[in-house]
Swiss-Prot record:
<dbReference type="InterPro" id="IPR000722">
    <property type="entry name" value="RNA_pol_asu"/>
</dbReference>
<feature type="binding site">
    <location>
        <position position="896"/>
    </location>
    <ligand>
        <name>Zn(2+) 2</name>
    </ligand>
</feature>
<dbReference type="Pfam" id="PF00623">
    <property type="entry name" value="RNA_pol_Rpb1_2"/>
</dbReference>
<comment type="function">
    <text>DNA-dependent RNA polymerase catalyzes the transcription of DNA into RNA using the four ribonucleoside triphosphates as substrates.</text>
</comment>
<dbReference type="InterPro" id="IPR045867">
    <property type="entry name" value="DNA-dir_RpoC_beta_prime"/>
</dbReference>
<keyword id="KW-0548">Nucleotidyltransferase</keyword>
<feature type="binding site">
    <location>
        <position position="72"/>
    </location>
    <ligand>
        <name>Zn(2+) 1</name>
    </ligand>
</feature>
<dbReference type="GO" id="GO:0008270">
    <property type="term" value="F:zinc ion binding"/>
</dbReference>
<feature type="binding site">
    <location>
        <position position="85"/>
    </location>
    <ligand>
        <name>Zn(2+) 1</name>
    </ligand>
</feature>
<dbReference type="InterPro" id="IPR006592">
    <property type="entry name" value="RNA_pol_N"/>
</dbReference>
<keyword id="KW-0804">Transcription</keyword>
<dbReference type="GO" id="GO:0003899">
    <property type="term" value="F:DNA-directed RNA polymerase activity"/>
</dbReference>
<dbReference type="Pfam" id="PF05000">
    <property type="entry name" value="RNA_pol_Rpb1_4"/>
</dbReference>
<keyword id="KW-0862">Zinc</keyword>
<dbReference type="GO" id="GO:0003677">
    <property type="term" value="F:DNA binding"/>
</dbReference>
<dbReference type="Pfam" id="PF04983">
    <property type="entry name" value="RNA_pol_Rpb1_3"/>
</dbReference>
<comment type="subunit">
    <text>The RNAP catalytic core consists of 2 alpha, 1 beta, 1 beta' and 1 omega subunit. When a sigma factor is associated with the core the holoenzyme is formed, which can initiate transcription.</text>
</comment>
Length: 1408
């Protein structure tokens, strides 16, 4: 019977749809949805619990409470299906129609929809061209609005107060019409002719010259165009009929004790109905206008609260003073419909438990507790029991399982075999946070996890929990096995390096095994093969670390064949034993060295590239088993005596104390300022800490060689003891990369060093003790600062980082690889990244896995070695490096010409798989995860070094890294001072070192004021100092000699005499014009002029302009009036801020600000054109800088006086070059230098932040996000298209429209790129469903409804929300096939389906 009933329940058909449209409902539409009018505020009868008739839960309107049974019980059972009971009027049908049938309320007076009124900018206001304030006054009955002026001089939309209205009525009688409330507004909207308005606005747009007016018109035009295009009538923004939600969606549940739990909506609806009924009665009674008005206002407020409580005025509250949850609150926010129920569904067949380590597992296995497995695999067990005939019904099978009879366990074993399960650890920050494993049944209640996948899950075994999910359908199991199995996720999608890398004890074991000990037992023995070594080791003839000679059999893979060769190596016993687990094809020298963490990672990488996935997985497992086994045998422990405090520590500390006293003396005698003293003291202690740490590491890192016969230390010829690398436990742990770092050991055994205050500044008294010696109370107290800051930071940053990830995912979620090749030849030129003369990232790393855009030519014989369109793999980049090619043009996601999505060639290699990317890969989400995931990790890691001020020592000189010849860059300018030193006076000067062939080896910036120690054309050796400068101050240097004459240097006006409290000496400091007392002096700037012997002003070379040097705010003037100065002398010093400690805390906000494309506070100014700089007349508080371009057109800039201008008179600047100091504004970079420069800027800046933390992310991911930030364009000239100048549209839409217009032979639109921050880009996407589920739900839906937007369900989010397969990965095939079939239905013919597509459709459960 039940099966039969179920058959009848399936009445609804599967809806097939391609898009979802949103719009405004007309009153007729609302009535057509409705099944009856709700007239009473009653809900259910408190005695019978039956719904009241015509009430909010009325069965007649909304349907029966029980399946196939009317309310009075006259008709029961299925046979009366569809009958309407004549007694109670209820249709006999399923009770679930109460979830979908709506009612309506006929409002006695129209009310405005609050979303269109109050959601800024107010749509009602825009359509009527009235201010929000005015509309509100009309709606809430404070003023009349003229709806039809007739022949009177009144204006349409004019507001009249009560008195005005009376006066005008007396004056004009019935010649005009004015009304109050929503009726007035509705009349205005009714009589609005949208077409005429649009034509008027377009005309006005052509004639107006004012920028603000233009903006206003274009906004209004956009809204009116939207109404006209969508066919929505503006008067529908005023509600005459209110729809009522189906009752099951706002349930009323009886609790024990006769009380009810109810949805807030019932309360809100009740208020609306009460007020509406009262209003109807008042209107019937012809009550006085003032009472009716009040009631209408209350109705308007009640409807406002129902739609969006708290949007206007005070929120309506329930009995317990809690604001009621309105319809808008139901859908928005984290707990709203979108994020809670549509995107965040819970999953059936899952369990969670604590994880413990499973060192005996293979990489593709996980240990699943039997109890858990039994529960999770129940349906499969029931099925098997039925098939085997052990249980006749499901009920019997259930009983069998509950009794846990022995046969059940056998069946469980059988069911589980080769049925993968998915493990997930929250927070799932990237796709490796969920992986599939084959379960192995274990006793106990904890899940066993393979140690090597911990890095991917970021899991440890200190109480972490994981969830298990069971894939049910065959397709799901297949996807798990082929795509999600842990053995298929060896590489990290963020950077393409192995993520299955041993850590901790495994590393320690392998490190110990491959270390070499001098004079160990059995040193120098020869062995014929590995088994001999193994036998000797097991019999204790040789030690693990002894150096021996052994013949090793290796396999070479050549042309797909394995060739065997035997070589004799000098190696150690441990390494020889490890060679047994090397996969065939890897040479022995790869492990014939000390294996540290980095080396092991390289080893696994080499194995993956040479031997493939399967071999690598087996190898990784073997490495793990070996590592654990040898770590146990090594018996490395940790104890207090391992922490050796260096003997020189006291001497270093006392020397530093002396230095500090000296600085204090200089300070008291006035030679240095307070800031300089602080900086120097901090520097001294920073250096002392480093020296102690170095001494400690030197001492820890070596130990004497012990003679095995005598048991004493061996000595060399000079009588000094011979030393070897140390076997100190702590040193080994840090050196191998297993645990701990030099910085942490330094705190254990060196000195803790400088600590930071919570605001980031450094306390100048360091902690000289270490943890081994113990801290005293004061030192402990200072330490608590850092520790507490670390913990507080962690909590805050986790939230910030999660939010960044969410925004990134949202902006890129619809970016999927949709085609093989878009055919473009554009790309970016990649060079090695060099900073401070150091190669930060080699060219090979930047182009690996990219596709070449142009042919790569061998520089020696001009032959093409790699044609355009080829993917560069490891061998190719090796060749490029070997040939010394400096730059390569590669394809990039930025220039990909695919309309929706990306093409595989522009993306290149799929980093997580090591192969070219497949069509259907969701590269956008992967990019977002790759950037977001380390953010969280880093922020969680701030507290590991307990706030010890790891302040980067400030660079004060550059040294050459290689031998070569020095060349100054063309931008370098310098002067020679009296001491015959060269002083750099250009801001962009660089020292370049070339090799003998003239190829550039390194390049270093020489800052303004640096002393150049090596001249152009000289030969340098590696390690030689090229230039030096004072890092703490920026000098202002004179390029001319003469006698100093001050102008406008007036004490208390432009400069302040600062007398140091301690020394009593005075210095002149330039003060901020804003802080000056006297108003007239605002424009004065302190200037130095130079006079020659005759007392005339020194002129600039080649011109008759006098030299005058201006000082910026904060400069400390070092010369005195009348003093004689020579070329290259310092006139003033500008103190630099003492640097605060930089950890990712500076980093995370920095990344967010880059991706949000925010303009920095004090942005620098870039030159708009290429031309010559000159200075014009200063105006109030600003200096005027003029750039005259090559055509003689001048461009003026007004720059605040306190800003530092980097360009000088007569200098030639290029377009986009910086002329005023300050951080760059990404919008300027895009405008002046183009997309490529912008991408390079954002990529480099983001990479800088992550590099500081040692996190590797491939540039590709950042480029993908920049592409999404640039996906909208602004129309400059609309041509013959339908766009409005200044409108922002999606690039793809713009190109499609232009193509269409060009086909018709008309003029296409021109446009410029717009840079949108990720939040803005997410909200301005074409898909309103995606935008609404991200942020600002109300605003997005309001806008979409007016425009009658259609969502084509292109992205991933939209499809998840409507409950479809996503158009990525395996779901892409399904979507393509559906499209193909739709085509077939439309045209009657279609390309044939492949067999696999047919199979996929059949299995996906969708009707073909």
């Amino acid at each position: 019977m039940k099966a039969l009933l179920d058959l009848f329940k399936q009445v609804t058909q599967k809806e097939e749809f391609d898009s979802i449209k949103i719009g405004l409902a007309s009153p007729e539409k609302i009535r057509s949805w409705s099944y009856g009018e709700v007239k009473k505020p009653e809900t259910i009868n408190y005695r019978t619990f039956k719904p009241e008739r015509d009430g909010l839960f009325c069965a007649k309107i909304f349907g029966p409470v029980k399946d196939y049974e009317c309310l009075c019980g006259k008709y029961k059972r299925l046979k009366h299906r569809g009958v309407i009971c004549e007694k109670c009027g209820v249709e006999v049908t399923l009770s679930k129609v109460r979830r979908e049938r709506m009612g309506h309320i006929e409002l006695a007076s129209p009310v405005a929809h609050i979303w269109f009124l109050k959601s800024l900018p107010s749509r009602l206001g825009m359509v009527l061209d009235m201010t929000l304030r005015d509309i509100e006054r009309v709606l809430y009955f404070e003023a009349y609005v003229v709806t039809d002026p007739g022949l009177t001089p009144l204006q349409r939309c004019q507001l009249l107060t009560d008195d005005d209205y009376r006066a005008k009525t007396e004056e004009y009688g019935d010649d005009f019409r004015a009304s109050m409330g929503a009726e007035g507004i509705r009349d205005l909207l009714n009589t609005l002719n949208i077409r005429v308005e649009i034509d008027d606005l377009r005309r006005e747009m052509g004639t107006t010259g004012s920028e603000t007016k233009m903006k206003k018109i274009s906004k209004r035009l956009k809204v009116l165009e939207a109404f006209s295009k969508s066919g929505i009538k503006p008067e529908w923004m005023i509600l005459a009929v209110l729809p009522v939600l189906p009752p099951e969606l706002r349930p009323l549940v009886p609790l024990d004790g006769g009380r009810f739990a109810t949805s807030d909506l019932n309360d809100l609806y009740r208020r609306v109905i009460n007020r509406n009924n009262r209003l109807k009665r008042l209107l019937e009674l012809k009550a006085p206008e003032i009472i009716v008005r009040n009631e209408k206002r209350m109705l308007q407020e009640a409807v406002d609260s129902l739609l969006d409580n708290g949007r206007r005025g005070k929120a309506m509250t329930g009995a317990n003073k809690r604001p009621l949850k309105s319809l808008a609150d139901m859908i928005k926010g984290k707990g709203g419909r979108f994020r809670q129920n549509l995107l965040g569904k819970r999953v059936d067949y899952s369990g969670r438990s604590v994880i413990v380590v499973g060192p005996q597992l293979k990489l593709h296995q996980c240990g699943l507790p039997k109890k858990m497995a039994l529960e999770l695999f129940k349906p499969f067990i029931f099925n098997k029991l039925e098939i085997m005939g052990i249980a006749s019904t499901i009920k019997a099978a259930k009983r069998e399982v509950e009794n846990e009879s022995p046969i059940v366990w056998d069946i469980l074993e059988d069911v589980i075999r080769e049925h993968p399960v998915m493990l997930n650890r929250a927070p799932t920050l990237h796709r490796l946070g969920i992986q599939a494993f084959e379960p192995v049944l274990i006793e106990g209640k904890a899940i066993q996890l393979h140690p090597l996948v911990c890095a991917a899950f970021n899991a440890d075994f200190d109480g972490d929990q994981m969830a298990v999910h069971v894939p049910l359908s065959l397709e799901a199991q297949m996807e798990c096995r082929t795509l999600m199995m842990s053995t298929n996720n060896v590489l990290s999608p963020a950077n393409g390096e192995p993520i299955i890398v041993p850590s901790q004890d495994i590393v320690l074991g392998l490190y110990y095994t491959t270390r070499e000990k001098v004079n160990a037992r059995g040193e120098g023995m020869y062995f014929a093969n590995i088994s001999e070594v193994s036998r000797a080791y097991e019999n204790r003839v040789i030690e693990l670390n002894a150096r021996i000679f052994v013949r090793i059999r290796e396999y070479e893979l050549a042309d797909g064949e394995r060739r065997e060769k035997i070589t004799r190596y000098e190696t150690t016993v441990g390494r020889a034993l490890l060679s047994e687990i090397l996969p065939a094809g890897l040479p022995f020298p790869l492990i014939n060295k000390v294996l540290k963490k980095k080396e092991i990672s390289k080893l696994i990488n080499a194995s993956f590239r040479r031997c493939g996935l399967r071999e690598t997985v087996i190898f990784a497992d073997k490495l793990m088993y070996a590592g654990f086994s040898y770590a146990t045998r090594a018996g490395i422990s940790i104890c207090l005596d391992d922490m050796l405090t260096p003997a020189q520590k006291d001497a270093i500390i006392s020397a530093s104390e002396k230095e500090v006293q000296e600085i204090e003396l200089q300070y008291t005698s006035g030679l240095v300022t307070q800031g300089e003293r602080y900086n120097k003291v901090v520097d001294i202690w920073g250096r002392a800490g480093d020296q102690v740490a170095k001494a400690m590491m030197d001492q820890l890192g070596v130990e004497p060689i012990i003679d095995p016969e005598t048991g004493t230390a061996k000595t060399g010829e000079s009588g000094k003891p011979l030393i070897q690398e140390s076997f100190n436990s702590i040193y080994m742990m840090a050196d191998s990369g297993a645990r701990g770092s030099a910085a942490q050991i330094r705190q254990l055994a060196g000195m803790r060093g400088l600590m930071a205050k919570p605001d980031g500044s450094i306390i100048e008294t360091p902690i000289t003790a270490n943890f081994r010696e113990g801290l005293n109370v004061l030192q402990y107290f200072i330490s608590t600062h850092g520790a507490r800051k670390g913990l507080a930071d962690t909590a805050l940053k986790t939230a910030n980082s999660g939010y960044l990830t969410r925004r990134l995912v949202d902006v890129t979620q619809d970016l999927v690889v949709t085609q093989e090749d878009c055919g473009t030849s554009n790309g970016v030129v990649m060079k090695a990244l060099v900073e401070g003369g150091e190669v930060i990232e080699a060219l090979r790393e930047r182009i690996l896995g990219r596709v070449v855009a142009n042919d790569i030519i061998n520089p020696e014989h001009q032959a093409v070695i790699y044609p355009a369109g080829m993917l560069l793999d490891e061998n190719a980049v090796d060749t490029i490096e070997m040939l010394g090619i400096d730059e390569v043009k590669v394809r990039t996601p930025l220039t990909c010409e695919t309309r929706y999505g990306l093409c595989a060639k522009c993306y290149g290699r799929d980093l997580g798989r090591g192969t070219p990317v497949n069509v259907g890969e969701a590269v956008g989400v992967i990019a977002a995860q790759s950037i977001g995931e380390p953010g969280t990790q880093l922020t969680m890691r701030t507290f590991h070094i307990g706030g010890a001020a790891s302040r980067t020592a400030v660079a004060s000189q550059v040294e050459s890294k290689s031998n070569g010849i020095v060349r100054y860059s063309p931008t370098m300018r310098y002067v020679t001072n009296a001491r015959n030193e060269l002083i750099a006076i250009s801001r962009s000067g660089e020292v370049v070192i070339q090799d003998d062939n003239g190829r550039e080896r390194e390049r270093h910036k020489a800052p303004y004021g640096a002393t150049l120690l090596i001249r152009d054309g000289e030969v340098v050796k590696a390690g030689q100092v090229l230039a030096a400068w004072d890092p703490h101050t920026r000098p202002i240097i004179t390029e001319y000699s003469g006698k100093v004459r001050f102008e406008n240097v007036e004490e208390g006006v432009t400069v302040a005499k600062q007398i140091d409290e301690v020394t009593g000496l005075s210095t002149l400091v330039v003060i901020d014009p804003k802080r000056r007392g006297v108003v007239q002096t605002k424009g004065l700037r302190p200037v130095v002029k130079l006079l020659d012997e005759e007392g005339k002003e020194v002129r600039l070379a080649g011109s008759n302009l006098p030299v005058h040097i201006t000082f910026q705010v904060g400069s400390i003037i070092t010369v005195r009036d009348g003093q004689q100065v020579s070329v290259g002398e310092v006139l003033a010093r500008i103190p630099q801020e003492s640097s605060k400690t930089r950890d990712i805390t500076g980093g995370l906000p920095r990344v967010a600000e880059l991706f949000e494309a925010r303009s920095p506070k004090d942005a620098g100014v870039l030159a708009e054109v290429t031309g010559i700089v000159s200075f014009g007349k200063d105006t109030k508080g600003k200096q005027r800088l003029v750039i005259t371009d090559l055509d003689g057109v001048s461009h003026e800039y007004l720059i605040p006086k306190d800003k530092h201008v980097t360009a000088h008179d007569g200098q030639v600047v290029n377009k986009g070059e910086s002329i005023v100091d300050g951080p760059a504004d990404p919008h300027d970079i895009l405008r002046l230098l183009g997309v490529e420069a912008l991408a390079r800027y954002i990529t480099d800046e983001v990479q800088d932040v992550y590099r500081l933390q040692g996190v590797k992310i491939n540039d590709k991911h950042i480029e993908v996000i920049v592409r999404q930030m640039l996906r909208r364009v602004q129309i400059v000239d609309s041509g013959d298209t339908r766009f409005i100048p200044g409108e922002q549209v999606e690039r793809a839409e713009m190109l499609a429209e232009n193509e269409q217009v060009e086909l018709e032979g008309k003029r296409p639109a021109t446009y410029e790129y717009m840079l949108l921050g990720i939040t803005k880009a997410s909200l301005s996407t074409d898909s309103f469903i995606s935008a609404a589920s991200f942020q600002e739900t109300t605003r997005v839906l309001t806008e979409a409804a007016i425009m009658g937007k259609k969502d084509d369900l292109r992205g991933l989010k939209e499809n998840v929300i409507v409950g479809r397969l996503i158009p990525a990965g395996t779901g892409l095939t399904f979507h393509n096939t559906r499209k193909r079939q739709r085509l077939m239905l439309d045209t009657g013919e279609a390309p044939p389906l492949s067999e696999e597509e047919t199979g996929e459709i059949r299995n996906s459960g969708y009707a073909v």
